[in-house]
Swiss-Prot record:
Belongs to the anelloviridae capsid protein family. This is Capsid protein. One of its GO terms (cellular component) is T=1 icosahedral viral capsid. It is found in: Virion. The lineage of its organism: Viruses, Viruses incertae sedis, Anelloviridae, Betatorquevirus, Betatorquevirus homini1. Keywords: Capsid protein, T=1 icosahedral capsid protein, Virion.
Amino acid sequence: MPPFYYRRRWYSNPWRRKRLRFRRRRLRRPIRKRFRRRRWVRRRRFFRFKRKLRKIRIDQWQPETIRKCHVKGNLCLLTCGRGNINHNYILTSESYVPTSEPGGGSWSILQMTTRVLYDEYKAARNWWTKSNSLLPLTKYIRCKLKFYRSDQTDYIVTIQRTGPFEVTLESYLSTQPSRHLMNHKAFIVPKLGRGPNKETYVKKIVRPPALFQSKWYFSQDIYNTPLFILTVSSCSLDQMYAPQDQISTNISLFSLNTNVFQINNWHKQPYTTKAASTLETYLYCYHNGHEPTQELKWKDIILLGNMTNYTDGKKYNTSGTTPLDLFKTENKPYWGNVFTNLNQDQDVIIYYGTKPKQDDNWTSTAPILPITSLYVECRYNPFKDKGTGNKVYLVPTDSGLGSFLTLPTKSELIITDLPLWLITWGWIEWLKKSRPVAHIEEEYQVVIQSKYIHPQLPCYVLIDKYFRHPPEGQHYITELSETDKLHWHPKYSMQTEQLELIAETGPAAPKINNTKQIEAHLNYDFLFKWGGSPAPMETITDPAEQEKFPSPSNQLQGLQIESPGKPKQYYLYTFDEKRSELTMPAAKRLKKDFTTPTFFTDFGTKDIPLKTQEETDQISEDEEIETSLPKEDHLKQQLQRTRQYYREGIRKLLKTKKLFPL
């Protein structure tokens, strides 16, 4: 048998092998040695080279002190009054609502951060089970959410844990209930009464964000970092397309007669209705029950050229003047506004015409004609609206020489090729958020160009009932605000009711017809770990100097909660203390001023910042030291840096070791 056929044996355990007794062999007569195959086998040794690991494990040492903290509280997701469904609740949650006007909104996009939780704690709306005082490190574990079922409405929720944590126009339009239902990550919280034996809440567990690592962060560094984003939209699943209190899915809209009113600048003095390229046309009226069959004399005329103030106008003093004097700016107190209650009365006829001629006197006949109507009643069918060719844009009310058909030059002020019920849902709210222009409510008006509204007009400037039927007589003194008295003309604040009617016709839009207000809320339970190395001098106090409380001895003192955005340089650590005294570097650090990076937003901490908004740059310590030092010390430091730079350059050229300083 060849040697390479020898069978290898398993290595036995030498510690368990039975050791044989040593015996000496006796001497024998030498004979021819016969062949015996060897029992031992050569051990093959393989040389193995250690390969590079595909991944490495990075460990982080735990802080000396760790406390588990639960942050528990309730959070309002949305509140919406009847007639305000196309608004974002978060943008107006901290605003004052005028008397007898709806507030809130039927949808919201909000973020949850440690800054939000601390603000809620200061407002006494949540509770922290453990104090984070002197513990600058934070580790976010998870959050338990309970979405309670509302008694008035169903609502849809989407939880976002991955970035980017920003909002865009598409984010606002996606809150429309029919589009929100198409999100595969969305879930529905049905209202009470759907399944009487079901739980009264929907429970969800939210893990940390996708890019978070299982490590300790400084609380200041994640102060503004969103833990997750909630998108909430109320909806009507039982009135998906048709409201119960209406007999049709079509709605009636009232638009300004844009065949008569063509110029959008209401601050023009006196106001002309036609475009600048045509002959200037003015508006006139007669009071005191003037009959249309009578002759129209300039002496009885009232010029309706003041479209800013709420005034009816009055007759001009004809002694020693001509009709052309009425158009001078100093005679503005005699001008009237066509949109007052008196001038919009059915018995008052509004006329349009040109200026009087140079040779006309007060007894001359005025060449003016009556207009058909100030407003046009229109009908809108949401099922007919395909979105093709629709244009909705903003035009200013106090500037420009163009007409309502003039499109804005800014692309942010126009939106096209979408259904009107979708545009009116979130586009205006996006403009309030992104702010391409300021003072939208008072200085801009919404213009619609669409072929899905009947009858056809060049464009539509929708007007609310409050503007079409203003307070009568002296009642306007108390009912109108000072802003309305000085800016009584079509503007966005006088169009919100009509735009809300269009938004309500959208699929699954909430129908608030059985109550005056709807609301939705949740209960949250955040789990954090606070960590740090608090200095001993902060925990030891002389017993003789302890404060004595007049309350009973069994009453516990409240926890001391610090803002998570407190700069980490203000904390005292174990290495800051030596022999029960504060070290010099610690004292120098505490004397400096540090700031916490924040986001600039005017809508509260729950509102999500825009994509263009960035964190405020924090000044580095080196720059602070340089600015605080005198000029001479600053020059010395600069000289020392330059000297060190040249030393390094010389070492690289010589390519020698650093054996002695240069």
